[in-house]
Design a protein with these regions (language model features):
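Chalcogenol-based redox active-site neighborhoods
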Residues: 1-154
């Protein structure tokens, strides 16, 4: 089970592909964001998902929503993944899996494996929506854009 909607997302700090540490509450103060957790750099599904976020980056950017990818891969792997796919957003390395566990994205029977889960957070880091069991990254992103657009209009 993912973290519940309307709960404040837990704070964390992880190394980022931008060369600095990312701290959720500090770096996203007064800014909405998407935290998307994924299993493995360069796997087919994760590559498709990253490319879908890349291809819709401008939509989220115009809505002032930051996209952040998180997996248990090393920073070296993340740097290669980001460069190869020309990703315009940062990736965070959770090599020990602590943040994946905190956000309940680990499979119970295979705790070293992260399941594809996306959290949409508002500017106060409250969870607005959760997407899990993602099989079609394009449908996932389309649904998220529709959800964000509705919430922005309110």
């Amino acid at each position: 089970m993912p973290l519940p909607i309307n709960q404040k997302a837990p704070d964390f700090t992880l190394p980022s592909t931008n060369g600095r540490n990312f701290t959720l509450y500090k770096d996203m103060k007064e800014k909405p964001c998407i935290l998307y957790f994924y299993p493995k750099d360069f796997s087919v599904g994760c590559t498709n998902e990253a490319c879908s976020f890349r291809d819709t980056f401008e939509v989220f950017h115009e809505l002032n929503i930051k996209i952040i990818g998180i997996s248990r891969d090393s920073m070296e792997s993340h740097q290669k993944f980001k460069k190869t796919l020309n990703l315009p957003f940062d990736l965070l390395a959770d090599e020990g899996g602590k943040v994946c566990a905190l956000y309940k994205t680990q499979l119970p029977f295979v705790p070293l494996f992260t399941k594809r889960t996306t959290y949409l957070l508002d500017k106060n880091q409250t969870i607005l929506a959760v997407y899990e069991n993602i099989f079609s990254s394009k449908r996932h992103i389309k649904s998220m854009v529709e959800n964000v657009t509705k919430k922005q209009a309110v």
